[in-house]
Amino acid sequence: MRVGIIGCSGRMGTLLSSLLRSSNRFTLGPGFSRQSPYSLDSVIESNDVLVDFSSSSFSEELLIALLSNPKPLIFATTKPEPSYSVDEKLQRLAAYVPVVVCPNTSLGAYVQKRLVGLLARVFDDRYDIRISEVHHREKKDPVSGTAKELASILCHTKQEAWQQEYSIGSRCHSVKNIELHVSRVGNISGEHEVAFISDKEHISIHHKVFSRAVFAEGALRILDWLIDESPPPGCYGPEVGLKVSM
């Protein structure tokens, strides 16, 4: 399988390129970045599958090109805000090829999301909720895709389990608030914590990445799944691509 990386000259693109070069299952094809000598259309044409590690500002352009020449896609980028246009194009592309939407390809990050969903069902509104995320100072996203996913899981679960409406930064009395704290400091690869805090106790689920290699390894795991399972067209989540059963 020939793999093309969108955002090939970035930190994640460079790490995944190194893993692919040492793999006996995959061939590293031409990648795309603003500095690469290849056009986006030629990169799509030359590869069997694409991994997007670029940026949210490029998502629309990439998906428009892919809709003209559909190829399987691992979408490992934070969606832009608002995301409805990108979501619509991802769904259209998924009618033709398998699309794995996984803004955070770390196995630990996926497990954290599942645990957060479980705790949101257990703890009622006597527990305040706080999401904290820390990344390196060069990260462009004002809020990480993982933090957005965690907030979405909390809001959905609270509505489903408790019939309570939650949102980030709510100042409305009828909508309960999820506090969000974002830091961009140093060279931190990624850190996310979700805390449930009452007057009497505090429980938190904390995931910290020590090396960005974990994201590249997660992407490789999803590529393995694409080869092993040959899934039909459709939109898949990280639990399928990362081969996790919980």
UniProtKB/Swiss-Prot annotation:
This is 4-hydroxy-tetrahydrodipicolinate reductase. Pathway: Amino-acid biosynthesis; L-lysine biosynthesis via DAP pathway; (S)-tetrahydrodipicolinate from L-aspartate: step 4/4. The keyword NADP applies. Transmembrane segments: none annotated. Catalyzes the conversion of 4-hydroxy-tetrahydrodipicolinate (HTPA) to tetrahydrodipicolinate. InterPro entries: DapB_C (IPR022663), DapB_N (IPR000846), DapB_N_CS (IPR022664), DHDPR_bac (IPR023940), NAD(P)-bd_dom_sf (IPR036291). Its main location: cytoplasm. It comes from Chlamydia abortus (strain DSM 27085 / S26/3).
